[in-house]
Amino acid sequence: MAAALRSSCAAARRLLRISPAALSTLTAASSRPAAVAPLARPIAAAAVSGGNNAFSWNLRRLFSSNEKHLPAISDPEVESAFKDLMAASWTGLPDSLVIEAKKAASKATDDKAGKEALLNVFRAAEACEEFGGVLVTLRMALDDLCGITGENVGPLPGYIEDAVKSAYKRYMKYLESFGPEENYLRKKVENELGTKMIHLKMRCSGVGSEWGKITLIGTSGISGSYVELRA
């Protein structure tokens, strides 16, 4: 399993991955052909297509209670892409949102700090999308082992147990990589991945007490809720 070290701003290094060998064994052992499908990028039906439609304006208004916790961004285009990313679900990033973010991140602007904040959020979104797919694949493998009604419940095979433990370590190390000034981003990641981690916990008895650190809604310490932002 690769190490997950980062410098203070190097969000690109925060890739959450179970080791290739473990994932290869996991997907090969799962009897469900579509097990690796979550790693693909679906096109969402209700995509956030840009900064000028009514849906995008509603998302901006929902950010009002959290403005003081977000980085200051002076460039309007960069700010719009940043807020649209924060308000979107990272389970499947819409292509239109990816295009918007890349366009804003590649433009020439004097707002270097705002551009860096956008890049950090975009990298985190892509990492969560990828790792979320791995967690779904792992959950599906557990479901296949247990059976529809739990008739096959028994000790976990070693490769599954190793994958579950690896997923937990990757998740916690990723959260710990965020600095105090990135609390808003940490909470967003908790929101996106916490539920998927809880799904794994629910399917495995005897997990360590450290799993109690995983929260379903990571909004403690900030006003408002990112769940509301995606409503």
Swiss-Prot record:
Record-linked Pfam families: SDH5_plant
Pathway named in the protein's UniProt entry: Carbohydrate metabolism; tricarboxylic acid cycle
GO biological process, one term: tricarboxylic acid cycle
InterPro entries linked to this entry: SDH5 (IPR025397)
Topology with respect to the bilayer: Peripheral membrane protein
Subcellular location: Mitochondrion inner membrane
GO CC annotations, alphabetized: mitochondrial inner membrane; respiratory chain complex II (succinate dehydrogenase)
Subunit architecture: Component of complex II composed of eight subunits in plants: four classical SDH subunits SDH1, SDH2, SDH3 and SDH4 (a flavoprotein (FP), an iron-sulfur protein (IP), and a cytochrome b composed of a large and a small subunit.), as well as four subunits unknown in mitochondria from bacteria and heterotrophic eukaryotes.
This protein's name: Succinate dehydrogenase subunit 5, mitochondrial
Name of the gene encoding the protein in the UniProt record: SDH5
